């Protein structure tokens, strides 16, 4: 919860580019920091509004002098594979549910092995402790057995990363699988075929889950990207295998997305972007309960602008969410959260990479033009706000970052977060396009945490219970990190 010392709102967008008065805009919250030029949607520049800038400066000074206590990071109270002793692992058959859903090109070559690499620490830990690893995953959304969704193309890279020859079986249940499991040596790894080749997987049918569980002695879930799904291999198997624990990747996701967000070092800022308010309602409302500063970007800002009575040209607007936008602004104000909307935007005459573009105040978007990125003044204001923080979380681009011309805002935020990370600020990048942005800029490695989840990250930030997590064994006692 934001402190009472931050109860006043930040000045909003001027009615016109030459106005001398501003409407008060309630603070709204953002979840993750964008670091690359904002490519997805544009915002109008604040250059025309000195009052906006002055009000922001006043707010930032108040945050710097705030006496709000700095709090540590608490870990999620789930038992982890690291809590198991060597004796509990040696010689044991361990069913590991990983998320190896990597992209493949037309020739079945892996184009991004991030998820495979993310699964390696847990697998290597089990191998080093003499466990027999039975590795399970899905790939894509097959309708029954579909050769192009086979996990076979993953074997060479997995083997290379693990330093052993991974054995691949043509099914995930049945006599052949049982035979190979029985012959698996300590430290060996057997990769099962795509669990989604069976419709029973996504239906979480108990009999299918029981067959999967019968292969092993204990269960490790390291598939954060599917933890929000109650499937047989993510939730059903836990009813038949004990212990059922979190892998290192899943535990890290929980530590950051639950621990660092619920009990952050302060000031705590959230950056939320993306095209639609409707897709981020839950995240924004949840973050308003926790953050001190909320920075909004992406296409959703135009719904907030219109709700304030501003002209938005042909920019994306969710007409049925105008009242919601107003209520979120009011809620931010009531919670004492400093909500910053872009004061200037980069607009275009069409939605295309070669569109004509210009920078205008957010209050001066002409008819026939659409916002596709935040402007330079907004980037500076956002950066100034971020300079006051100790924890930042970012979810969603600032603009249409698929088009280079409108990626500047997103990329600028990515670079700023990298700079802050080097100064000891906790920086959390939450899935999807935000991850793509920091990777494009080349700063992914310096962030405190980059989430591997898309929908799972959003649901966790919204405060929802993830079936794949709640099903795991509780830790012996809450652990403070």
From Swiss-Prot:
The keyword Heme does not apply. It comes from the Eukaryota. One of its GO terms (biological process) is glycolytic process. (2R)-3-phosphoglycerate binds at residues 98-99, 101, 115, 137-138, 140-141, 196, 228-229. It is an enzyme of class 2 (transferase). ATP binds at residues 280, 299, 371, 402, 433-434. GO terms for molecular function: ADP binding; ATP binding; metal ion binding; phosphoglycerate kinase activity. Its EC number is 2.7.2.3. The keyword rRNA processing does not apply. Its cofactor is Mg(2+). It is found in: Plastid, Chloroplast. Monomer. Belongs to the phosphoglycerate kinase family. This is Phosphoglycerate kinase, chloroplastic.
